[in-house]
């Protein structure tokens, strides 16, 4: 059985990590390369860099950053945010990203999923899906959770797998930032719809939440602030999960 993965997410703007981090032993907590390296050394299984830079002109900064990260880190890393076309996705992968995460662009142009998958392999395509309940149905939202697409979550999950995605990053808008736990109802809803790995996102606040996500059917769990602010120690988290019967990677810790 494949090991369940713990993923740290870094929001990057103009080549710097935003949302404060307070690792005392890091000289520059705003440097994504240094932070990424630190995370890889303490047992995080994968990294996700979300580029929240608004302007296209700043894209060059992200490309240079990806190259630096690729040189320094020996765990898989995904780059997402603002990838609107095949050219951008392609350049990020060629510069060293292991995977690209697409969201709004995939909804607007589903063939982009297929194009990336056919060129680089399905394993390089993560489709990020932001969803929330509307009148009792899980609906897909885009533009950072602001726009209701009118697409049912169940339909979009099936579609992205058919198009060639390798993984789904499932974020519960209702839970994001609340630290009240992952949306296990949503994970359980999606699990039977697809054979793709599901990354649970949104709501991590304590170690039990990770266990709940895995028991609900998630293959990986992503978190940001609980790691950045050292509210959860990665080694302790993995030992806790192992103790509760979850297969996690402990070697090197």
UniProtKB/Swiss-Prot annotation:
InterPro entries: Aldolase_TIM, His_biosynth, HisF, IGPS_HisA/HisF, RibuloseP-bd_barrel. It is an enzyme of class 4 (lyase). It catalyses: 5-[(5-phospho-1-deoxy-D-ribulos-1-ylimino)methylamino]-1-(5-phospho-beta-D-ribosyl)imidazole-4-carboxamide + L-glutamine = D-erythro-1-(imidazol-4-yl)glycerol 3-phosphate + 5-amino-1-(5-phospho-beta-D-ribosyl)imidazole-4-carboxamide + L-glutamate + H(+). It is found in: Cytoplasm. SUPFAM superfamilies: Ribulose-phoshate binding barrel. The active site is at 11, 130. One of its GO terms (biological process) is L-histidine biosynthetic process. Heterodimer of HisH and HisF. IGPS catalyzes the conversion of PRFAR and glutamine to IGP, AICAR and glutamate. The HisF subunit catalyzes the cyclization activity that produces IGP and AICAR from PRFAR using the ammonia provided by the HisH subunit. This is Imidazole glycerol phosphate synthase subunit HisF. It comes from Thermotoga sp. (strain RQ2).
């Amino acid at each position: 059985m494949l090991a369940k993965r713990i993923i740290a997410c870094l929001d990057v703007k103009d080549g710097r990590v935003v949302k404060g981090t307070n690792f005392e032993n890091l000289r520059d907590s705003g440097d994504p390369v240094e932070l990424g390296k630190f995370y890889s050394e303490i047992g995080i299984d994968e990294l996700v860099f979300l580029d929240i830079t608004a302007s296209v002109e700043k894209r060059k900064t992200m490309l240079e950053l990806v190259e630096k990260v690729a040189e320094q880190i020996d765990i898989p890393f995904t780059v997402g945010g603002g990838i609107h076309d095949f050219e951008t996705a392609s350049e990020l992968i060629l510069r060293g990203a292991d995977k690209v995460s697409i969201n709004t662009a995939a909804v607007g142009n589903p063939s982009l999923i297929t194009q990336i998958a056919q060129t680089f392999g399905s394993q390089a395509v993560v489709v990020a899906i932001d969803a929330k309940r509307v009148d009792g149905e899980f609906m897909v939202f885009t533009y950072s959770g602001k726009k209701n697409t009118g697409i049912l979550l169940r339909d979009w999950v099936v579609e992205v797998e058919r198009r060639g995605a390798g993984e789904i990053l499932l974020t519960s808008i209702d839970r994001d930032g609340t630290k009240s736990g992952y949306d296990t109802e949503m994970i359980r809803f999606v699990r039977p719809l697809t054979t793709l790995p599901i990354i649970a996102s949104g709501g991590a606040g304590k170690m039990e939440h990770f266990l709940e996500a895995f028991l609900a059917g998630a293959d990986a769990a992503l978190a940001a602030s609980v790691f950045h602010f050292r509210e959860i120690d990665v080694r302790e988290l993995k030992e806790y999960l192992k103790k509760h019967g979850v297969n996690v990677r402990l070697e090197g810790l």
